[in-house]
Amino acid sequence: MRMRYKPWAEDYLKKEPNIVDIDGSHAGRISEWFDNDQPIYIEVGSGRGQFITTLAAKHPEINFISMEREKSVMIKVLDKVIEQGLTNIKLICNDAIELNDYFKDGEVSRLYLNFSDPWPKKRHTKRRLTYQTYLALYKQVLKDDGEIHFKTDNRGLFAYSLESMSQFGMYFTKINLNLHEEDDEENIETEYERKFSDKGSRIYRMEAKFH
């Protein structure tokens, strides 16, 4: 369900410049923004932020970036960060296509893609976050041993992503064809994931690296 547009969202986000980058002011100096040398994990398309804020709370030794282009959605993430007093998470309000403007080559240790828009129509293939254009960006910002963790309830997108990544020269270290049936204790659910798994939807997951 698409969140209703909130005309006041931009002003709300601008009140927390130490947490939120809405204008590219921290582009190219993300590590300096955190002011430490901890590993950086990114979630592209964070939605309401349940996944990444839960992860950040569990792992204070890691720096997290929530990248979400919709300002009306990002305010939900910001509220969670403030309410939980998290200091190891920053928010970037921009599109994934701008990744290499924000991150230096090899600066990121892990990238999460959770329940991305499947863009099912063939003419929209290039918009999928596992299309080769995006994979090239991920390869650039990830460390040599960096990982992509991907989850979806869309079988078509999962199959496409496996093929797209394979053709790009990636390999898979883990593939789950029914995540919740396997009872993975390390799994952290997104809001979307909980909603659809409760309805019996199968959740697909994989972890991948570049050769």
From Swiss-Prot:
Methyltransferase listed as a keyword: yes
Pfam families per UniProt: Methyltransf_4
Residues reported in the UniProt entry to bind S-adenosyl-L-methionine: E43, E68, D95, D117
GO function term, MF aspect, one: tRNA (guanine(46)-N7)-methyltransferase activity
EC number(s) given by UniProt: 2.1.1.33
Keywords, alphabetical: Methyltransferase, S-adenosyl-L-methionine, Transferase, tRNA processing
NCBIfam families: PRK00121.2-2, tRNA (guanosine(46)-N7)-methyltransferase TrmB
The protein's name: tRNA (guanine-N(7)-)-methyltransferase
